[in-house]
Amino acid sequence: MATHPVKEQHDMETPEDAPDTPAGEPRSSSYLEEKAFKSRTLLIFGAITDASARDVTRRLIALDADSDAPIDILVSSPGGHLESGDTIHDVVRFIAAPVRMIGTGWVGSAATHLYLAVPRERRFCLPNTRFLIHQPSGGAGGPASDIAIHAQEIIKARERIARTIARETGKSFEAVMTDIERDRWLSAQEAVEYGLVSRIIERKSELSG
């Protein structure tokens, strides 16, 4: 869970009109983005950066203003910039519309943190999802005093992440601190048993089941 920015991804634009395509040809990515937006479904795929956090936040605010119907977020991410994950986590809790998290592929590091922004009963995953929890990491150079400051910030971040995991899973803070000392991988079923996930689902219809 890096505490320094990674390379930003380009913003994804949502067009006002879907492009015309000849019969049988695949739709453009912008058309698919628009359809996903209208279905109140957001995607968090790939590394989490300030650019992707800005994009997700913009969409969450727009969907929240449009309706108080549930918003579904599909998450498949190895993590990334911790503070960008914090942004998504906090905005999900800030808006009025309920959000449902659906893990797929793998949900790791800072992505696990934002995944835990919703109550357990609204946390789902698909059968082959894997989860990773661990302590944040990062590098620092420069004067010894700056390195010491950075080390203290890493310690604070580790404790904050552990408290979030403990709060959302029902585990003790001490147990979580031990679990995240090293990389802890969990299968979908293990994530249910740990308290990260409420249910494993295979179809969208099961979200409201």
Q: Where do the PLM segments sit?
A:
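N-terminal organellar transit peptides
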Residues: M1-A110, L116-G209
